[in-house]
Design a protein with these regions (language model features):
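A generic structural signal for short beta-strands and their flanking turns/coil linkers
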Residues: 111-113, 125-127, 150-155, 189-191
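N-terminal small/polar loop signature for handling phosphorylated ligands or for N-terminal nucleophile
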Residues: 1-21
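Short glycine-/acidic-enriched loop or helix-start segments at secondary-structure transitions
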Residues: 12-15, 35-37, 140-141, 168
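ATP/nucleoside-binding phosphotransfer catalytic cores, i.e., glycine-rich phosphate-binding loops
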Residues: 121, 148, 158-232
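Short acidic/glycine-rich loop or secondary-structure boundary segments that cap or lie
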Residues: 79-82, 125, 137-140, 164-168
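Glycine-rich phosphate/pyrophosphate-binding beta-alpha loops
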Residues: 75, 79, 130-144, 212
Length: 232
């Protein structure tokens, strides 16, 4: 099976497969191609086809949130609200730059409700969190710096700082690969993650692989080595 598109298209295919072990090839053509970046896939049609023809495969983990499968991450809080409000034309033209600009503007102006997150035996209060299967997020932002798509774990980064300085420094850190090291960020690893409302606040939105998916509560789990992809 060959997919031509971005992360949203890949997500639809993964959900359509519903666990069927069919090797999947990806020819990147979307506005953001985080999975392709993570796997080192070429971004030209000819080279991407050559990777598929070579036949080398890699099994990666697949996450599940409230019944929906994903390959990249679940983002909760202001990033999901940003996805909800992001102008499609801006997304196509500016990619991750449009995302960060919209996120900063939205969070600084309006803020967002806190929520509770449980990862393993640890609990956090946050206004933004990512349960990640991969390092990269929204493009080349290294939010979950230790994540690997085949390690059987979700890497969680929780953040709680609404100040402009805090937000800018967090996203700058993510751009150079150490977003989880921010003073206001907390990292954890787990096979299951739960997100819930805090103090009657809500609704709190979440996004899956860059697409708006719903509101909390949400339960995230992982299927190890559940998807086979063609890789270089």
């Amino acid at each position: 099976l060959v997919v031509v598109g971005g992360d949203g298209t890949v997500n639809e295919v993964v959900n359509g497969l519903k666990g069927a072990r069919v090797p999947v090839g990806i020819i990147p053509s979307g506005s953001v191609n985080v999975l392709s970046l993570e796997l080192g896939l070429p971004h030209t049609v000819e080279k991407a086809c050559a990777v598929i023809a070579a036949g080398r495969t890699r099994d990666i983990d697949v996450g599940i949130v409230n019944g929906r499968r994903f390959t990249l991450m679940v983002g909760v809080g202001f990033d999901a609200l940003t996805v909800k409000n992001l102008n499609p034309a801006s997304k196509r033209r500016y990619n991750e730059a449009a995302f960060v600009w919209t996120a900063l503007r939205k969070e600084v102006r309006q803020g967002g409700p806190d929520f509770v997150m449980k990862a393993g035996d640890r609990r956090f209060l946050a206004n933004f969190a990512v349960a990640a299967n991969t390092r990269y997020y929204g493009g080349r932002f290294g939010v979950a710096r230790k994540a690997q798509p085949d390690d059987g774990r979700l890497d969680v980064v929780a953040f709680r700082d609404r100040s402009l300085v805090g937000l800018v420094s967090f996203w700058f850190g993510a751009l150079v690969g150490w977003g989880g090291l921010h003073v206001s960020a907390t990292e954890a690893r787990a096979q299951q993650v739960e997100f819930g409302l805090y103090g009657g606040c809500g609704p709190v939105w979440y996004q899956v692989d860059g697409e708006l998916a719903g509101t909390l509560p949400a339960r995230v789990s992982l299927e190890p080595a559940a998807l086979t992809l063609y890789v270089p």
